[in-house]
């Protein structure tokens, strides 16, 4: 059917139920191959490592300052490329990634080993759910 793709986004119309599903099939698989990221051995269910909640505490603690080793320019550039690629995907069809991408993007200019680990966890998450999309 004509008009079922736009800017790399696949649009599947369900007129009978008045719904529309947008997705980007194959985008995540291509991204994982491009950045040579292996499939996770067990599913990653969250896009970002969160601080544990202290139930009953008067206040929640903020994360401690990242004092891990700084990355070289090549590894920092790789993080920037991954964040850019996933930002396009997240804004188009998978907005659950935006909070994690925002946190990583804020630290990518002075990327550390901890930032690289956060990107690795995010790639594990998208590898767990490669065919995600939005239904309107």
Task: Describe the function of each predicted region.
Residues 1-136:
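Long, low-complexity, charge-biased intrinsically disordered regions
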């Amino acid at each position: 059917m004509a008009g079922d793709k736009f800017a790399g986004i696949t649009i599947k119309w369900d007129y009978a139920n008045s719904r529309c599903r947008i997705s980007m099939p194959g985008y995540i698989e291509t991204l994982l191959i491009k950045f040579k990221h292996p499939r996770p051995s067990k599913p990653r269910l969250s896009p970002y490592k969160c601080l544990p909640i202290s139930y009953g505490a008067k206040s929640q603690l903020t994360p401690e300052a990242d004092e891990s080793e700084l990355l070289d320019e090549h590894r920092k550039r790789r993080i920037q490329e991954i964040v850019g690629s996933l930002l396009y995907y997240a804004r188009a069809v998978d907005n659950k990634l935006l909070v994690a991408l925002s946190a990583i993007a804020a630290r990518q200019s002075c990327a550390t080993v901890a930032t690289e680990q956060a990107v690795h966890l995010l790639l594990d998450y998208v590898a767990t759910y490669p065919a995600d999309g939005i239904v309107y």
